Amino acid sequence: MPLINLKHAETFVEGLDHPEGVAVGPDGKIYAGGEAGQVYRIDYEKRRIEEYADTGGLNLGMALDSAANLYMCTADRGAVYKVTPAGEVSQYSSGTTERPMTTPNYPAFDEQGNLYVTNSGSWYGNDGCIYCVASDGTTAVIDTENSQFPNGCAVSPDGQYLYVAMSLSPPQIIRFPIESGRKVGPTETVVELPHVVPDGLAFCTDGSFLISCYRPDTILRVLPDGDLTILMDDYEGTILGAPTNVCFGGPDLSVLFWANLGRWHLGLNAHTGLKGAALFYPDIGAA
């Protein structure tokens, strides 16, 4: 049985265009994207949606810097776009000359401003990779080993590892050590996840982390000792409707949010008893 049922799970806001990604900014706002290019900024207290930019394509994962510039993976345009708070959109990276991005899926910053980006490739194509985009926009491929649809990713709270949700063959969460924008050690399997499609990741202050699963409609929790538990599960697929990404927000990062690619809303649960680990919001400057 789930450790937390859906009693306290609710719709945060609705009327979004199949949101795949969700993130909290340094300004406390909640950010999301739509499948037709929409970029949403949402006031947490007022639950007011502002559509303030358009990337022109299918928006997936996102990350923010210290100035609340948003870095959006726009899959069908093969690029990561930078969106300023004023809504100005510019291309931040499209990969390398030798290996252009095909399906950029999720970005995650480290403290130095390196942006790690998963490029999922095609379903069962075994053609994914992981990039690192330096704060000046210089891009390098740092991993081709983990090629079976690398999906959501997160830098560990201590900045030592990049965790990646591998959606296929087998579904699992992996990690490898990083330093100065480079992969500096071997890949390790953190947990295998048979019969699910892991998508998003979020770290908690107690050393556990959450996994949002595109299939089935479930959010899992990996405890510090490695045990796997179910945090929330929705067999009807209504409150959790293909929950693709998760983040913590609210005044003390104790409110859990999730995006629902299969529906039109963001979900919220303020009673999980968990707090999110602080994210990295680097100062990118004018890069």
Labelled PLM ranges:
Residues 1-7, 35-36, 42, 119, ...:
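Blade/loop signatures of beta-propeller domains
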Residues 50-54, 90-94, 141-144, 184-191, ...:
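Beta-propeller fold detector
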Residues 38-40, 79-81, 128-131, 172-174, ...:
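A short loop-to-beta-strand structural motif that recurs across blades of beta-propeller domains
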Residues 1-16, 93, 187, 284-285:
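A short helix->beta-strand "capping" segment at the edge of beta-propeller domains
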Residues 43-47, 84-88, 133-137, 177-182, ...:
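Short loop/turn segments that connect beta-strands within beta-propeller blades
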Residues 245-287:
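Blade-level signature of beta-propeller repeat domains, shared across WD40, Kelch, NHL, RCC1
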Residues 14-27, 55-74, 97-118, 122, ...:
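Beta-rich, blade/repeat-based domains predominating
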Residues 35, 75-76, 121-128, 167-172, ...:
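Short, solvent-exposed loop/turn segments at conserved positions within beta-propeller repeat blades
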